[in-house]
Amino acid sequence: MTANGKGATASVRRLGVARQVAIEIRKGRRKRLWLICAAMLGVLLLWFGYQSARQVEVTSDYRVLLYSLPTVNAVFLPLLSAVVTSTVCDVENRANMWKQLLTMERAEDLFCAKWLTCALVLAAVVTAEVTGASAIGGALGFQAVPASEGLVLWVSTLAVCLFVATVVECLCLFVANQFVPLVVGVALSFLGLFSMYLPAYVSVFVPSSYFGLLSTVGMSYDSATEVITWSTVAWPVGYFAVIVLVTVAAFALSLRAFARKEL
């Protein structure tokens, strides 16, 4: 095949994935996916606002916001990520339409399209969350969050959400009962309640703990004076690399397994 022929084939495949993503987004609208995300995000921000309103009485340091938000994320976002992914995959599972779809689409394209759809939805959710949290902090009287630190928070949060979504998509595509992926999301959210209190050598094995592990804010408490001191720490690139590598590995293995799956 000539270079032009290969380029044309690759272009067609990219267009195929793009069309499939557009179809998945339309399916999500019919399933009220955006409404579900908005409701869960609203509860998250209400809880965050309640906690922040109590803390602003002690200090207006913006780092309080950057410390508190990952704690809330560890509880809410694993479940939200699981709900998004399960909803995107649920239509085909309920109607047992995989065989019909794979007569029109390559298995790899279908898998990637569903993953990209989840990634786009989660990116929108995380963007709305970080923007909303910053606005709440400003309204309560906290210092403005620097754009660079807000960006790091956005990248860190999305990376963990995508890891959860990748694992849940694998479960959705290989397990007919969609209750199982949701149980995984609930379990990760439950573990998120305790993730900030686990020793580092334990928390690295808990996916929801990475919301806190990737934080750029440190906190120290002086029991004698009962004073909390906030500090900025270097972004833990090592933890970020771990979550990215594990996500890539899970994606590659799931993609290969789905392409070879007997339907």
Question: Model features per residue range: what roles?
Answer:
Residues M1-A38:
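Aromatic- and glycine-rich beta-strand/loop motifs that create alpha-glucan
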Residues A3, R14, Q51, Q55-V64, ...:
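Terminal transmembrane helical anchor/hairpin motif
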Residues A10-A22, V88-K99, F163-L191:
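Cytoplasmic juxtamembrane interface segments
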Residues M40-T87, C112-Q178, L191-L193, T225-V237:
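Secretory targeting signals
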Residues L80-E92, E169-F179, I243-R260:
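Transmembrane alpha-helical segments in integral membrane proteins
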Residues S86-L120:
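Helix-loop-helix units of permease transmembrane domains in multi-pass membrane transporters
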